[in-house]
Amino acid sequence: VDFIKRHIFPGSFIPSVAAMLAAKTRSSDLALVHLEDFGPSYARTLHDWRERFLARREDVRAQGFDERFLRMWTFYLAYCEGGFRERSIGVAHVLMAKPGYRGGSYLPGLLEA
């Protein structure tokens, strides 16, 4: 994560699901309505992005990006793909609701998927 925070998304904050839920419990009256872990399918997405990125590397160079940039993004995409495949990193959709929520979908289609 340090590589990602330093080189890919500087200044970002990447909390774990556990940290988000703990903060929710401490600081709000929100209720967890739905949580979907989609790390395994995101690994495939990252793989496809890396393949497309590498296939267009000449276009990337033509935009003025150097070899360091190409290596950094190739590494990032491969690193995250492996992390999601091995389940050492994760990504999730989290849906929370205020009190009074009665079960209707806030995001049509989300809970039916």
Name each model-derived stretch.
Residues 1-103, 111-113:
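Substrate-binding/catalytic lobe of Class I Rossmann-like enzymes that use SAM or dcSAM, i.e.
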